[in-house]
Amino acid sequence: MPRIMIKGGVWRNTEDEILKAAVMKYGKNQWSRIASLLHRKSAKQCKARWYEWLDPSIKKTEWSREEEEKLLHLAKLMPTQWRTIAPIIGRTAAQCLEHYEFLLDKTAQRDNEEETTDDPRKLKPGEIDPNPETKPARPDPIDMDEDELEMLSEARARLANTQGKKAKRKAREKQLEEARRLAALQKRRELRAAGIEIQKKRKKKRGVDYNAEIPFEKKPALGFYDTSEENYQALDADFRKLRQQDLDGELRSEKEGRDRKKDKQHLKRKKESDLPSAILQTSGVSEFTKKRSKLVLPAPQISDAELQEVVKVGQASEVARQTAEESGITNSASSTLLSEYNVTNNSIALRTPRTPASQDRILQEAQNLMALTNVDTPLKGGLNTPLHESDFSGVTPQRQVVQTPNTVLSTPFRTPSNGAEGLTPRSGTTPKPVTNATPGRTPLRDKLNINPEDGMADYSDPSYVKQMERESREHLRLGLLGLPAPKNDFEIVLPENAEKELEEREIDDTYIEDAADVDARKQAIRDAERVKEMKRMHKAVQKDLPRPSEVNETILRPLNVEPPLTDLQKSEELIKKEMITMLHYDLLHHPYEPSGNKKGKNVGFATNNSEHITYLEHSPYEKFSKEDLKKAQDALVQEMEVVKQGMSHGELSSEAYNQVWEECYSQVLYLPAQSRYTRANLASKKDRIESLEKRLEINRGHMTTEAKRAAKMEKKMKILLGGYQSRAMGLMKQLNDLWDQIEQAHLELRTFEELKKHEDSAIPRRLECLKEDVQRQQEREKELQQRYADLLMEKETLQAKF
């Protein structure tokens, strides 16, 4: 009988290494292929081994106290839900279950007073581990079995073969087939060029011959078509990338050599930066070294600034006392005021007060879970199972912050008196005998009683308590006597500058305004000034409209002409002169820089500044106030109304305005070569072509900008309305389905109504037929019964005769 091989058992180091290498090659989805490398393990066991032990993300360190508290708390909230508890703690489900049982067994041992140092979950001799996938690997024996050696050699060979023979053979066959096809094609072309036609032998194939026919071809209708879009430029073939080494790809030896070189550089950099760890890594000791855990200390109870303040106070008093001693002042007042506050020598060693005793939360939670597990049925009655105080306030347990008692934060320069252990008693009292007290530090003394506290009083003395009561009653009586006499007539008088005081709050000198607030206020003031200055500028500057780069002063008429100018012409000349002055001022102070131009292009503006300055010196620019500009604007509006009424002008429609604008705009032509405008009838054909090309370029730029803007808006609207659109499509589909169902239901209803009508008319006929059949059957049965009776009688008669 052949031996039956059962897969499973303890994992060995060799199997772990093979499994890790196989996962690196095949991934985490092909467990059957991975298990084929391990003769003693199944695919399910390989997957469990990876996800329970070999995965680098698994935490294998010792359980901290916080993790144990969280484990017991979550086990209480979600019992037996280890797959849910595991990601919250950061461990695997098997680790959580194993440590949970370990804590319960440990608690049971403590309850039974069995003090053993062994792990309660440790397997006894002869037991089989039910979960070998969650345990460390067993070391490999020196002399392996033949099966293990064969498995190891096979796995090494399969994992080392990154480029399999089958893939190489397929690629080679494909390349040969392609070369054969190209050779045959070249041969047919050469024969056809020589005038020899060879009919290609076609093999009868079921289906479509994709080399000779075009599948699903639809020939276009006869006629003429525009083929301008079909012209394209063929790509230049880069024959340098068609070499054999580029087609085969990178060799494995080159890749390994590059990786080794990279590892050497990494090790060299590590030696330069961290020499000890590099030495440990090269010597192989890094696997056994363990870094020390971070020292966790409680938060400090007093800051460095407070310590410096205490030191400064002590140094100041010490300097004053030494000065008084050097000057020879030894009277009682000085000695009382300048008392020595140094800590006296104490032969007893100082000890830090112990922290308050805390309860073992882990032990309490484990005892609670053990008690709940072993509880009897509630049908028996009686008292509930006694449990420790538990916490159900959240998913994770509340942590108790352990703090070292701080003796420095107590009130300085005082001496408590009511039985504080290990402290110097207050003067004038007899210290109480204290037994079994831990001596603490010698406190700071307060001979002047500057810092009295409740702890200073000796409440055990009855006379002291009575004296304090008398003093408090006397103080209260004096306070009540000092109250003013009550008055019932009140008059409310507001101060004269109450509104100003409410509007202008007093600024505290001690308050330091934040620098960000100061900068924001200054920036707001600058912005307001900039807006105010912008409002005082011309409309063309405010709207950033294009402005001429050169001023044409030839539009002015000479004054000494014959015949002399009329008043209207003189007014027009004044307007032109003011316009030229404004242009010079704007070109000097607010030169126009198109947004498309780059820095350094407008060089001509700097050269013309001297001309603008010279002109403004002869014809100074006059600034007007806001009120004057408002009056002038109102006067212009009134004059426009008068002219409109006098000339009988109505409201101009948008169509008429556009027509006039197009006519005026068509008479002006922009010359990009000269960067200026001119009349269209004065421009040459070349200038017209350049102007139209420039306009086409500008329009294309606008079109591109608007297309990008539209695409961005479309994308944004798609994001905003995509859900609504999909929802609307779904609802429309549901509505159509419901409508189809309604139509189908109506059709079925009418069908069944017709069927009912036919059935109602056919039922009486069928009933008559059935009744006739029944009657006919009854008559036939009667006849047969009568015949049967006659035959029976005849049989009896014959039997009686014979």
Swiss-Prot record:
SMART domains: SANT (SM00717). This is Cell division cycle 5-like protein. GO terms for cellular component: cytoplasm; nuclear speck; nucleus; Prp19 complex; spliceosomal complex; U2-type catalytic step 2 spliceosome. Residues 200-206 are annotated as: Required for interaction with CTNNBL1. Residues 501-659 are annotated as: Interaction with DAPK3. It comes from Mus musculus. A motif (Nuclear localization signal) lies at residues 165-271. The modification Phosphoserine is found at residues 303, 358, 417. Residues 1-56, 57-108 form the HTH myb-type domain. Residues 108-143, 246-278, 408-460 are annotated as: Disordered. Residues 142-245, 676-701, 764-802 form a coiled coil. GO terms for molecular function: DNA binding; RNA binding; WD40-repeat domain binding. GO terms for biological process: DNA damage checkpoint signaling; DNA repair; mRNA splicing, via spliceosome. Residues 260-606 are annotated as: Interaction with PPP1R8. Homodimer. Interacts with DAPK3. Component of the precatalytic, catalytic and postcatalytic spliceosome complexes. Part of a spliceosomal 'core' complex consisting of CDC5L, PLRG1, SPF27, CCAP1, CCAP3 and CCAP6. Interacts with PLRG1, Lodestar/TTF2, and NIPP1/PPP1R8. Component of the minor spliceosome, which splices U12-type introns. Within this complex, interacts with SCNM1. Component of the PRP19-CDC5L splicing complex composed of a core complex comprising a homotetramer of PRPF19, CDC5L, PLRG1 and BCAS2, and at least three less stably associated proteins CTNNBL1, CWC15 and HSPA8. The modification Phosphothreonine is found at residues 227, 377, 385, 396, 404, 411, 415, 424, 430, 438, 442. It comes from the Eukaryota.
